[in-house]
Structure formats: structure tokens, C-alpha cells
Amino acid sequence: MPPELQKRVHEAVEQARQRSGWPAKRTLAALGIPRRTYYRWLKEEAWARALPAESVKPVQPFEALAEEKQAVLNYARKHPELRHRELAWRMVDEDVACLSASTVYRILKEANLVCPWRRRSKLRRGEEEKATRPNQRWVTDLMQLQVGDGTYYFVSFMDEHARYIVHHELLLGMDGISTSLAAQAAIETLPRGEDGLPREKPEIQSDNGSSFIAREFLQVLQEHGLGHHRIKPHCPEENGVIERSFRTLREALEGEELSNLLAAERVLARLVRWYNQERLHSALGYLPPEVVYRGRGEERKEQRRRKLAQARHRRREKNLGLQQGSLPFVAEETVANP
């Protein structure tokens, strides 16, 4: 038998042993080759002398498939505003491509699609001071907006743990009555007990603005049994989570037409839905705030883990099949006459 075919038989025996656990005796019997002949081939290794050495690329079982790489590039071009980590988790959630963030980064870098990173200062606070569950602490603040020819005030109540905007309104003024009515509407979103009071009583955190120290605002909190914590004067970083959400919303408002109050309310309602339900938040492990607020965070993480594991398994099978052949045997007619 020519050395080339001897080599193919040897590769088939090794592959059958590695992939199926078959001993050489069983594989050789299936191929119709006497064991004595096979071991003589091994001793002589004629194929090693007859064939030039070939540089063989090591098999990378979990390398991203060509179709996965293309899917990443297509998705990245459709969403140039997303960075690689958020891009990776969005594609997992939407079943576009189940790849790790580091793999997505390498694919984008090879295609020169990685945006330069702008370092932003992080507003930090002690771990012991942070909320550890939904409805433990709400943060509130006002953001001034220009609508048409007038000035309005966007007030937001955000769950600190989940980064979920519980309630928002566009106010005509920043007086105590307006903010107290907004606070009442936010508190009404909480589930109630038999006594009519909220079953959960989040602490309300605000700055020391006149609207948040007004008698009307404090009275609403007291009526519902909610505590009030005011941050230190001139320390807006203590309200960092809501300040960051305002920056995100301002960026999203660029290019939007806020010609009148009704149009502005529609735009803000749409952006708040996007922020709560679609935007993946890095501090939440790239989960949408609503998923965490509703207590479905671990369920979503488990879905992601399962998708990644399944994709990894499929990738391994396909890569091994492409580089090693789908069957461990050579054609029977090529070895009929050893």
C-alpha cells in the first residue's frame, strides 16, 4: 500500500481512539486490515520518509465560526453606538451570536471596528452604603430641559439597586407641590398591604434643593412611612446613579424635536422605556434595569450561560468536523489490498 494511504489509515485509527474510544483492534477490523500489517507500517513509518513535513495548524475547537464572525460584524455596523461588551450580551439575548465579550472584541479589532475608549471618572461610594435589593432606596432629582420657548423640569425617581426609573414627569416648575405630586405618583407604583400602606418602603434620597426640603414633599413621605435621606451639600457624586442616568437621557435627546410639552412628554416616555427595558447597564452585568427590578436577573443570566454553553458545544463539533473529518475512517476501497 502506498505510504500516503498508510498514513491515512494511521490517522483514522488515532481519530477513532480519541473521539470514540475504539481500540486499534476494533478499528482495523472495521477497515479490513490485519493488525500485523498495521504494526509493521508503524515500525517502518514509510509515510514519514515519503511525504514532506506539512505545517498543520493546531485545531482550535472553540474558535468562532465564520458565520458567527460575520454576524458580529453585521450587528456592529448596525449598532455603531454600542461598545463590545454590551454588543456581546445583546447578541446573546437576541440569538444573533453567542460569543464572549473578549471574542467579540477580537473580531471587531481585526475589522478595525473598535471605537477609542474615553475614560470617564466613576462616582464611587462605600459598598456598605449601596442598596442591595430593589425598593430599598430610591434616588430622585430634577433635570432642566428646554422645550420650545419655555423651560421645564424633568423629575425622576430611580431605584438605586436596579437603576430602574420607577416614575418620571415633566414639571412646569420645581416647587414643593409639583415634586410632592410626582412623589405620590411614584409611591403608588409600590404594592400595597392590607392596611393600604406600601409593603415595601424605600428610603428616598435627594439633594438639598428647595423642592425636596419643602413641607409638601416631606409630608407625602411621612404619610406613607418612607424615610428621607439628603446628601451632603455640594456633593452631587452621592447622587451619582441618577446623575449618570440624566447624562444618558441627555445624550439620547440629541436630535429629538421638543417643540412643545406634549411632544416632549412623548419623547421622554419613549426614552425612559428604552432606558428601563432595552439599555444594558454595565453595573448590572449588562442586564436591562427592568429585568433586575422585577427579580428576573438570575433567570436571564442562566439563559445566557445556557446559550453560551450550547454555542460552545456546537462550535467545537463543527470545528473538529471541518479540520478532522466527520468520520474517523478512510474509504474502504482504498485499503482493500494491504
Regions found by a protein language model. Give the residues of each.
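C-terminal domain-tail junction helix/linker
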Residues: 58, 222-224, 248-338
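Acidic/histidine-rich, metal-coordinating catalytic segments
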Residues: 193-213, 239, 287-290
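Basic, flexible linker segments flanking DNA-binding modules
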Residues: 39-137, 235-236, 293-297, 302, ...
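Short hydrophobic alpha-helix segments
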Residues: 168-169
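Mobile-element integrase/transposase regions
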Residues: 97-98, 102-158, 164, 177-201, ...
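Residue-centric detector for conserved, function-critical "anchor" positions
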Residues: 1-33, 42-57, 63, 71, ...
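RNase H-like polynucleotidyl transferase catalytic core
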Residues: 200-208, 222-241, 257-261
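Residue-level signal for the short linker/turn that defines the boundary of a DNA-recognition helix
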Residues: 21-23, 82, 99, 259
